[in-house]
């Protein structure tokens, strides 16, 4: 089932993820809004267990609530009336998954140039017992107070706070902040940054390229796959820390109640302080 709001009624807005231009991001950050229109979308949340938001270059704030009003509200902004009318906000539902997309209507010949921009700034509530998935291009997302959450970020930013269960994250060149979550799984970090605090369970990191990962407080084991040329900073871990491989990057570990084990290491450095268990670090290759 698909619900699409006609542009003539609501003129909904957003660049598709692949068309998140720097000019649009600058306009969003500086609050430019030459042409605007109020936006409202009633979410079809009946029986929903997963709410997926594909926001591209826009801003979205989602809060979990026991009795949510389940309505997105905000405004659309664009550099021209024509661009405003070409942007679409739509939702579709498949089984227990609701997908909300904010995209540009690519029909016609209107192009995107250096001074063009279009973005949406929305706030809404969903049931507190759902999984919220945020797909972010160059925009910004805030998710608070839900059962579980995931963030797939390109060059934008995402903040996930007070998540009861697991947070899953993946970032290219952007930034992700996680504060107070049941457990954490980071699939990959490119050149961006992930900062985590107050994780009440285990932490798993797939790969870190040239970016950074920092963790303060984890009530479980921390497992790291590979570290390239970036940096990893770990503090206050109640459990063991294990790392499969380190290239030229640096690992800084403090206040670990269990063991620290690094399987292989290149030219990078490992600093370990206040580790109560055994410390196993190979010599540089």
What are these regions (language model features)?
Residues 25-136, 142-153, 157-171, 175-188, ...:
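Acidic (Asp/Glu) and glycine-rich low-complexity loops/linkers
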Residues 9-21:
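Bacterial N-terminal signal peptides
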Residues 233, 239-242, 252, 258-261, ...:
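Extracytoplasmic/luminal low-complexity segments enriched in Pro/Gly and acidic/polar residues
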Residues 1-7:
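N-terminal secretory signal peptides that target proteins for export/translocation
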Residues 60, 193-194, 212-213, 231-232, ...:
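Short loop/beta submotifs within extracellular cysteine-rich repeat domains
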């Amino acid at each position: 089932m698909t619900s699409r709001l006609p542009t003539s009624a609501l003129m909904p807005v957003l660049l598709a993820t692949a068309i998140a231009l720097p000019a649009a991001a600058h306009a969003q950050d500086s609050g430019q809004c030459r042409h605007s229109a109020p936006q409202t979308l009633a979410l079809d949340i009946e029986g929903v267990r997963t709410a997926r938001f594909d926001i591209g270059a826009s801003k979205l704030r989602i809060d979990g609530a026991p009795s949510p009003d389940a309505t997105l509200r905000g405004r659309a902004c664009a550099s021209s009336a024509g661009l405003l009318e070409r942007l679409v906000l739509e939702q579709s539902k498949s089984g227990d998954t609701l997908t909300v997309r904010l995209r540009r209507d690519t029909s016609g010949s209107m192009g995107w140039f250096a001074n063009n921009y279009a973005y949406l700034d929305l706030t809404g509530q969903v049931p507190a017992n759902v999984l919220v998935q945020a797909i972010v291009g160059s925009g910004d997302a805030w998710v608070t107070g839900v059962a579980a959450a995931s963030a797939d970020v390109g060059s934008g930013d995402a903040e996930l706070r007070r998540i009861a269960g697991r947070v899953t994250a993946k970032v290219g060149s952007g930034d992700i902040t996680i504060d107070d979550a049941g457990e954490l799984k980071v699939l990959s970090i490119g050149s961006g940054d992930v900062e985590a605090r107050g994780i009440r369970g285990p932490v798993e990191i797939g790969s870190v390229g040239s970016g950074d990962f920092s963790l303060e407080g984890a009530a479980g084991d921390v497992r790291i796959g590979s570290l390239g040329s970036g940096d990893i900073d770990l503090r206050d871990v109640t459990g063991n820390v294990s790392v499969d491989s380190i290239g030229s990057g640096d690992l800084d570990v403090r206040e670990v109640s269990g063991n620290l084990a690094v399987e292989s290491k290149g030219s990078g450095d490992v600093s370990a302080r206040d580790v109560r268990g055994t410390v196993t670090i190979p010599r540089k290759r």
